Amino acid sequence: MTDRLVPQDSARTTGTRLRVLGAGACALFALAACAPPGGGSAPAASEAAPTDVSTELGEEPVELTLYDGAGLKAKDEALIAAFEEKYPNVTITGRYDPDDVQAQNSPRVLASDDPPDIARVIALSDVAGDGLLTNLDAYADAYNWDELPEGQLAQYRVNEDGVRGEGSQYTLADGFTVTGFYYNKELAQQLGMTTPPQTMDELQDLLAQAEEAGMVPIMAGNQTGGIVFTTQMMLNNALGAEAVNEWVFHAPEATIDTPEAAEAVGTVQDWAEAGYYPEDTNGTDATTALGRFANDEALFFFSGNWDAAALDEQMGDNVGFFLPPAPEGSEQATMSDPASNFAIPAGADEKDAAAAFLNFLRSEEARQVVADAGFAPSGEGEIPTTEEGSVNAQIQEAFAQLVEADGQVQFVQNATNGLTTTWNSEVQRLVDGATSPEDLLAAVQRQYESELGR
């Protein structure tokens, strides 16, 4: 979720800093808009759902094309280089559109007469329903992709009714974003915080102490939806990761307009009234909030891995990261979307080789490349090597905990194409006291159902 990206090299432990996801946290990964497919004939059913597949690439030269957003080029090119080193008979050429149009262009690219062999997909339900993607079930069986964490597999599946999280597999991601609390270690020490809070009660005690000490408890740029993050944190805790994901995935009769959700959103309103966010949060954007946090103006900053490089550079050892505390008796959960959710277009010529690339994304080599790029890696395995003590190292450890807890949750803003605007505006009104938790949730649910035609 960003408008500035990604690494320029893959150094692991040197002082070189990767330009990872920038502070404008709501552009690239929230681009869910999807234009109608363009020209090109619909693929045959046998192309869209192959059954005769192979995991062998042979020795003959194979040429593939990969399609993604330009901001992810450095990560992709590093993955391509690692794959080509392992499979020297395969050559992959990257093709990139500007980030702000890749989502709109993607359906036309997928439907063209000469589609790429590998393509990043955002609006999975739409393009799978249009028959533009290869059903990967046969490859999933061949490569044992069912061994992937269930929370990740859910992000790759869609059923015949367009409900995500179940049905056939159509994608496999190279890595993920991960969200949580950054904290200023020096300010934390002033409050007696020596380790991250383990419970919501401990977190709220720290917020109260910070406010009493004259600190800003949570820095947030709510002009660009910063408080939507803590709003979803409370919803994740109140409803559970599975229920929130079902809502984002369009499960039948799913609703977020419940008494439990209203109570959760009410806590966010209470925090605003208590002064736990900046007074000017609704007039502050994500980039400004990042800079103010880095300038020691707040104890906490809820954001994601896209801000790690900037904070590491500006704050050094003074910044830490932790996942949101879970309710008693529950597993940790937080927002974590795919970086590049790769599919194989139905009209692709080299499906077996493309599937081999998708499978490669689970390898230790690929996981290291993705971690070097500032993302959390796909699948499970050893935590990739990172600079000891860096905030990226803390993020990688936190993501490993999240995967073990099966706590990856989709961003609620991405449930439909138009919901980012609704969430942002309604949470701004909540902070201003211009709406209630109940009215906020009703407005969001109306927009959700309107876009889904329910």
Residue ranges of predicted features:
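Conserved N-terminal structural module of periplasmic/extracytoplasmic solute-binding proteins
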Residues: 2-130, 328-329, 369, 443-454
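Extracytoplasmic/periplasmic substrate-recognition and gating elements
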Residues: 85, 167, 189-191, 274, ...
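Hinge/lid segment of periplasmic solute-binding proteins
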Residues: 124-179, 320-322
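Short, solvent-exposed loop/beta-turn-alpha elements that line the ligand-binding surface or hinge
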Residues: 137-153, 222, 239-263, 313-314, ...
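Long, aromatic- and glycine/proline-rich binding clefts that accommodate carbohydrate-like moieties
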Residues: 151-154, 322, 372-421, 429
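Extracytoplasmic/periplasmic solute-binding protein
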Residues: 166-174, 179, 204-253, 298
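Conserved C-terminal helix/tail region of periplasmic/extracytoplasmic solute-binding proteins
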Residues: 189, 403-454
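Glycine-centered hinge/linker elements that transmit conformational signals in sensory
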Residues: 207, 250-281
